[in-house]
Amino acid sequence: MRAIITGGGTGGHIYPALAIARGLQSRFSKVQILYVGTNRGLEADIVPKANFPFQAITVSGLQRKISLENFKVLWQAYRGYREAVGIIKTFNPDVVIGTGGYVCGPVVMAAARRGIPTLIHEQNAFPGITNRILSKFADQVTVTFEDSIRYFGNKDNITLTGLPVRPEILQAERQTALEMFKLKNDKLTLLVFGGSRGARKINQAMVETIKKYGNDERLQILHATGQAGYEEFMQELKDNGISLEHYGNIIIKPYIYNMHEALVAADMVVSRAGAATLAELTVLGLPSILIPYPYASENHQEHNARALAERGAAVLIKDSQLTGEKLIQAIKDMLQNKEKLKNMAKSSQKLGRPEALSDIIKCVEKILPRQQ
């Protein structure tokens, strides 16, 4: 079996694509995979390091405002389409799978026009424009959030699968994780992070939160500031007269490399609302306070957060409205109402899809030529 996988620009498109690629390798003993991306996206660096063959095409995204640059983009789209046709002719795939990002457009379209089975996966509650267009041509559309289905015209080819999570998320053990971070068994653990680079607004709100909950008998806090914000955050604590030596329940790190262990140790989470993060929170049944990144394309993080908040799995605080006082109140509401915390955890777990990868692979099998 031969498969082309395409998706790029950001890690949110690339890592699900790589998860699907590995899922195909597990399911089909003789699968050959080619990853098609652009040289400008993160995939040009990430994919070869993941040991998958990589080919690039020329394509870039349209500007949202009227711009002469869009004439160049349209020319590149045509050129990228011709390059995609050439790659497809040479590689001769049995299936083409797209996970979003503008690079998907030419590749999935070229495959669909040649009658090659195609599948796309949408990570967010509000689908990206590329996937909204491609859904009209793809044989299968797999989605992470039920909320996203309304934005697609053809509902007959849509399957709610969820988003594949890292295998280590499901394999990690809580007691081992607690010991690793020197956390106590008899306290609730609040995990706070703002993505790999951190989030300045969350860090600012956490200064007051640490002041409030330092030495609290019910709660311990594990907070990742992000590498870029660590020094500034530690200085903020100092300027506010906060000395961590006096608190036995606060752990501050610039970055958490073994995030799967941190998540397993947590009882509640404060974070941004990227699709991959929410997939991991729900598969573990974690209640959360979500502060969506306000500059995400098409505001998709707010849509993601709302999908959880409306089902009782999370509290949504907009970035523009976040203050230390608001965060403290949200944490207080969860701490003081154990029944609410328990119900949020149940609601979160209901949304979790630990079989997401397996379900996506089944959708791939459904559209493969019979001889496969």
From Swiss-Prot:
Keywords (A to Z) from UniProt: Cell cycle, Cell division, Cell membrane, Cell shape, Cell wall biogenesis/degradation, Glycosyltransferase, Membrane, Peptidoglycan synthesis, Transferase
Gene Ontology terms: cellular component: plasma membrane
GO annotation (BP), single: lipid glycosylation
Recorded name of the encoding gene: murG
UniProt cross-references to Pfam families, sorted A to Z: Glyco_tran_28_C, Glyco_transf_28
Protein name: UDP-N-acetylglucosamine--N-acetylmuramyl-(pentapeptide) pyrophosphoryl-undecaprenol N-acetylglucosamine transferase
Keyword Cell cycle in annotation: yes
Catalyzed reactions per annotation: di-trans,octa-cis-undecaprenyl diphospho-N-acetyl-alpha-D-muramoyl-L-alanyl-D-glutamyl-meso-2,6-diaminopimeloyl-D-alanyl-D-alanine + UDP-N-acetyl-alpha-D-glucosamine = di-trans,octa-cis-undecaprenyl diphospho-[N-acetyl-alpha-D-glucosaminyl-(1->4)]-N-acetyl-alpha-D-muramoyl-L-alanyl-D-glutamyl-meso-2,6-diaminopimeloyl-D-alanyl-D-alanine + UDP + H(+)
Source organism (scientific name): Desulforamulus reducens (strain ATCC BAA-1160 / DSM 100696 / MI-1) (Desulfotomaculum reducens)
Bilayer topology term: Peripheral membrane protein
Gene3D superfamilies for this protein: Glycogen Phosphorylase B
NCBIfam families referenced in this protein's UniProt entry, alphabetically: murG (TIGR01133)
Family listed: Belongs to the glycosyltransferase 28 family. MurG subfamily.
Pathway field: Cell wall biogenesis; peptidoglycan biosynthesis
Protein's cellular compartments: Cell membrane
PANTHER family according to UniProt: GLYCOSYLTRANSFERASE (PTHR21015:SF22), UDP-N-ACETYLGLUCOSAMINE--N-ACETYLMURAMYL-(PENTAPEPTIDE) PYROPHOSPHORYL-UNDECAPRENOL N-ACETYLGLUCOSAMINE TRANSFERASE 1 (PTHR21015)
GO molecular function, one term: undecaprenyldiphospho-muramoylpentapeptide beta-N-acetylglucosaminyltransferase activity
Function text: Cell wall formation. Catalyzes the transfer of a GlcNAc subunit on undecaprenyl-pyrophosphoryl-MurNAc-pentapeptide (lipid intermediate I) to form undecaprenyl-pyrophosphoryl-MurNAc-(pentapeptide)GlcNAc (lipid intermediate II).
EC number, as in UniProt: 2.4.1.227
